[in-house]
Amino acid sequence: MPENVTVIGAGLAGSEATWQLAKRGIHVDLYEMRPKKETPAHETGEFAELVCTNSMRSNQLSNAVGLLKEEMRHLDSLIMKAADMTQVPAGGALAVDRDSFSKYVTDTLKGMDNVTVHEEEIVKIPEDGITIIATGPLTSDALAKQIQAFSGTDSLHFFDAAAPIIAADSIDMDIVYKKSRYDRGEAAYLNCPMSKEQYEKFANELIKAETAQLHGFENSDVFEGCMPIEVMAARGAKTMLFGPLKPVGLEDPHTGETPYAVVQLRQDNAAASMYNIVGFQTHLKFGEQKRVFSMIPGLENARFVRYGKMHRNTYMASPNVLTASYEAKNRPGLFFAGQMTGVEGYVESAGSGLVAGINAAREALGKETVAFPKNTALGSMANYVTTTSAKHFQPMNASFALLPALEGKKIRKKRERHEKISERGLASLDAFKTEVLD
């Protein structure tokens, strides 16, 4: 009979790991401290709660995270199944109804006979047995100290932020218009057009706005992919125009012209009663968010369902600690998964949980752990977090830069080249699944 496995943390990585274990017949003891003990960012006790955006980014195979998603679908990922079941309109991206998404994951795992859920905090790394630690970037202090001592290095960190969510019925639809950039796919976003004068006034007030105090925060500590909008604005007068306020491909049907700047709103739930402000992660004080963001055309009377906020994310110096199976080098049977390993992003975190879960299951069944092929997105992420120089280690999203170049004549068109890399990755994964995993 296979050994039981303990999974600590029911976020994206822990939930995916639990699913991969349980569907292989392994009994899982899943520990989650919420809702009994809260974190600075979570609001519910549900599994796989999305604390920042509701977007899982591109769904296209010309994008590395699109490849990662498709690889996970090929391996029967619970997180991808939940995302596909609860998606909301978002053009070429995959966005979800965050409440329905978490409920799907929670109900699925709690409904499995070989998953026992324990609502309690774990404060020590278990000394024996097969364990996956997937407690995320908001790991409780007691366990974080244990992990720091185990890894033999100081915890590394960066700051992450969430964007505000506003009520749909408070948006002025006489000003705002529905459109996706370059009219790709369905018209999935609401767009708030700005003139040059409106943009400059907004940018000026944004830079002057008062931020919430957060211990240890420095502007240099932010993750580039989730930068607070006020930090971006302070980098230069036009910086936002090349980021979330980029107007290209978003002509205003009211005027037939491209606005100077455009703020986009993305549907946040299936009922379309809430929208988040795309790219507006922030740590402004709540009153300042209301004052400054209400300067956006169409949001003058916006009702804020949730204000944006920032939290500290910690991660390990994984190259010193982990193998490509996410198993600890000096402690067989102990695995780590999720953002604490240095992968960055919802899908990347779930992907690491998938790899760790499959390998923990193999160990429980008396098989050898395996490294995924480096020409797959899953394998390239594992390779990055375990072989990069620990001295310069930083969190990383899925990227084609992590994958080996194609052999033969170079394909000049980037989209076509990336699609070929994805095609190669999926073929490699399917062969690996047949020859090694099945």
Curated annotation (Swiss-Prot):
GO terms assigned for molecular function: flavin adenine dinucleotide binding; tRNA (uracil(54)-C5)-methyltransferase activity, 5,10-methylenetetrahydrofolate-dependent
Q: What class of enzyme is it?
A: transferase
Biological process (GO) annotations held by this record are: tRNA methylation; tRNA wobble uridine modification
Keyword hit for Ion transport: no
What is any one of the record's Gene Ontology cellular component terms? cytosol
Q: What's its job?
A: Catalyzes the folate-dependent formation of 5-methyl-uridine at position 54 (M-5-U54) in all tRNAs.
Q: Which family does it belong to?
A: Belongs to the MnmG family. TrmFO subfamily.
The name of this protein is Methylenetetrahydrofolate--tRNA-(uracil-5-)-methyltransferase TrmFO
> Which species does the entry assign this protein to?
Lactobacillus acidophilus (strain ATCC 700396 / NCK56 / N2 / NCFM)
List the taxonomic lineage: Bacteria, Bacillati, Bacillota, Bacilli, Lactobacillales
